[in-house]
């Protein structure tokens, strides 16, 4: 996402796995902070330099068109992430693998402290979001302080959106 959790997750995955065994997919909702696009550009450059495949997944819907169709995103109807992030990422994986029914492992940078719903997540699951997809949430129990300590200790790029008072760097 270009946020702090994704930055940590990407660093951990790059250290744990051979670069030819995974790809990075940025789900571009079209509603990101300009600072987030700067961070993603930096991450893409780093991936290109170390040979890690980097892709961008976008919805075929224009964000304004989606708002007109579905109304503004809300806690009750959270269409935004599925329409502009999750589904385009799934479509991109199908394109990359050349298979509609691929089996893959998705590393997700979610944390239990972010919401009540996320506090109920498991470290791993199979097929909850996408058939054939294993999901692994390695930083699930990390606190925000632990994420920031990791970022500063590893000298990872910080999204300027945080320095401007935003508590998150995902879509607007």
Model-assigned labels for residue ranges:
Residues 1:
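Class I SAM-dependent methyltransferase core
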Residues 4-172:
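Nucleotide-activated chemistry modules centered on ATP-dependent adenylation/adenylyltransferase
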């Amino acid at each position: 996402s270009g946020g702090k959790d994704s930055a940590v997750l990407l660093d951990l995955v790059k250290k744990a796995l051979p670069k030819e065994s995974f790809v990075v997919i940025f789900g571009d909702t079209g509603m990101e902070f300009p600072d987030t696009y700067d961070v993603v550009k930096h991450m893409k450059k780093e991936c290109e330099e170390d040979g890690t495949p980097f892709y961008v997944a976008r919805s075929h819907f224009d964000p304004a068109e989606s708002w007109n169709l579905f109304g503004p995103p809300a806690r009750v109807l959270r269409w935004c992430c599925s329409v502009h992030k999750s589904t385009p990422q799934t479509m991109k994986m199908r394109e990359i693998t050349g298979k509609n029914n691929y089996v893959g492992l998705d590393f997700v940078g979610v944390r239990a402290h972010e919401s009540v719903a996320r506090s109920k997540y498991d470290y791993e699951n199979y097929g909850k979001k996408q058939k054939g997809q294993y999901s692994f949430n390695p930083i699930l129990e990390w606190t925000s302080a632990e994420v920031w300590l990791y970022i500063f200790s590893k000298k990872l790029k910080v999204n300027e959106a945080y320095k401007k008072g935003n508590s998150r760097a995902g879509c607007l």
